[in-house]
């Protein structure tokens, strides 16, 4: 602090009553008053104009107030209120020099500023010096009486006034001792106090409640300057430690902290200028409110720009910060302590309230960082839980035990991390984030649990599917009386091998027995559904299977060798056996049989369909007499019905229609074989032919061309008869047969001739190539067949080859129509029609008849 600058007087309020805030702020900064807290005192001086007030202050406190120049005349020197700091006196003492009263410049009637300045001095001063002349003591019309009356009057305007020390300084003391002057002065003061109108609350209040009255005397400065200076120095000693108990202002009340002195003074003067009653307690609260707000705002700004806080905030954005709670708590505590240090002297209630607001703002500022820290801890806890759980499960530990141990350790670690992140200044509750972490762990555990259970279930299902699908399909392909018994045994064997292993794996999850049994039951139901779905799939292709079974039995013997229809076979019996085998297959696929209870499906189908009792025996028989005129099987649950009785009846009709061709073909083949291997005509017929046809025979022998033409004609007619299937065409009548044969005759004849010509050209080409390449050898020439003779491999023989192929129906899978949902069998008739073989009738057996002409 620059003492010279501090002692320099600064105008606080000018002569017009305007508060000089700028110059006052410069004074406060230069004098260092703001940092004194409550350890400062304010001294002001009142008195008549030109009574030596400024001189006394300069001598007493070492200030530099402007003094009157007596050589220029007696006039007003101090205008308004001036302020300076006392040099060399502790505690810090601020001195105010007020404009003198009773000055001719303002006039007798202009006392407004006088009263306002007096009230201002009483409101902010701890000690008020009353400068008065010694010769005025005891006078009725003394110059000091209006001043005292003014002081006492304005004191009444102070609501709950503070106690102020009034130090009467008697100037130009005479020979009368002070001991005699003081009682007279006090008596005059009491009279003036009694004469002042007071509120009812203070009507009988003694002056000592408002003022601490003290009296001192000083000799004349002009006449006894040395003595004056000595006594002034003695008086100066009384201002040392003036605010300490027993000092001049030891019992002062309502002190405003030094940092709020300037603002308080400005607001008090504003109220006084508005001619309002001055409520000092309320003013004290107001000053405390404003100053505490300023201090709090300043400390909050300091926190926002604090380098440590900015670094901590930046670090926590990228990841968890070790020791976050301690670091953040230290930063907050530093700034809160600075607030407490500066605001400690203000009103406690206001200070505490503003501190709470500052604390709230600070916590709101730093809480996002705390929440970010918790978010990092939450993420880290969940990731660590996932990793540790996977490692624990991989080690072979049971799922429930692994979850229990891992959850407990990670939640405890997270709870400890949250506790370390909390600062002492806040009562942040992290139970919600802890609950969120718990839910995260539970959700992840549930997800892993469902995944593990699903994995176990899918693995068991896959094993069941592999164990059941192909064997069941194979059993259905070889359907027989024991098919369902074999399926039941297979189902029991595989489920008893797979389900216990599955149940053992579930033990590690420590689930309730009802839940475990439910999962095993569902898996068993899944195994049943595999069999049932396969049965439904095969039932949808039952017509194909029936035709395949029929073809296998009908076209092959008991050694599985293809049959050759030589005419010795009983086609009727073989066909009945083949149809019976197909009917048994139909009965197997008609219903699902999970129990060992026998049913009558095969018996009903055999008696109704195979024995030919599909239709009623008499016209009067009702539909109810037909056992297949129903949608359910007796003693079979509808849900286990694959093919209803009515569907079986429809399938059987379609099956018979589509297999009738194979039977007819077999019969035709037998007949052709018999015709091809028939005996020669009877002897009498041969004799008759020789006698009656002797001339014709001789003609043919004499002219071989006729014989050749006859042979060629025979072959053509024979080929046409085979191709046109004359016998079959005439089964529907003579006229339709003639029309049909006539329509097919010319195209068939053209095809035969084209075939013969092509085969002859190919054979001639082969002979020429062989003759050109073969070397000359000494061999007997091989006799070549005449061109008019046909070998077993002749073109005509090749032409007949497709007619002797054995019956082999094409197997084609039938895809169920999406629109058919009411029946297990999907469009059996259409499926059968798609599978109908397209073959020619075989009138002969090529293996036994080559039709060679030598």
From Swiss-Prot:
Highest rank taxon of the organism: Eukaryota
GO terms under cellular component: endoplasmic reticulum; endoplasmic reticulum membrane
Ranges of Polar residues composition bias in the record: 842-854
Q: Which residues face the membrane's Cytoplasmic side?
A: 1-680, 726-854
Binding residue positions for GTP: 47-54
Q: Where is the GB1/RHD3-type G domain?
A: 37-252
Enzyme Commission number(s) from the entry:
3.6.5.-
Cysteine disulfide links:
none
GO MF term list? GTP binding; GTPase activity
Write down the SUPFAM superfamilies for this protein, in alphabetical order.
P-loop containing nucleoside triphosphate hydrolases
Give the start-end ranges of region Disordered.
758-854
Q: GO annotations under biological process?
A: endoplasmic reticulum membrane fusion
Q: Does the record bear Coiled coil in its keywords?
A: yes
- Gene3D superfamilies recorded: P-loop containing nucleotide triphosphate hydrolases (3.40.50.300)
Q: Where is the composition biased (Low complexity)?
A: 758-781, 814-828
Q: How does it sit in the membrane?
A: Multi-pass membrane protein
All ranges on the Lumenal side of the membrane: 702-704
Record localization? Endoplasmic reticulum membrane
**What are the UniProt keywords, alphabetically?**
Coiled coil, Endoplasmic reticulum, GTP-binding, Hydrolase, Membrane, Nucleotide-binding, Transmembrane, Transmembrane helix
Coiled-coil positions are 217-242
TM ranges? 681-701, 705-725
Q: What does this protein do?
A: Probable GTP-binding protein that may be involved in cell development.
Q: Which family does it belong to?
A: Belongs to the TRAFAC class dynamin-like GTPase superfamily. GB1/RHD3 GTPase family. RHD3 subfamily.
**Which PANTHER family has this protein been placed in?**
PROTEIN ROOT HAIR DEFECTIVE 3 HOMOLOG 2 (PTHR45923:SF20), PROTEIN SEY1 (PTHR45923)
Query: Which protein are we looking at?
Result: Protein ROOT HAIR DEFECTIVE 3 homolog 1
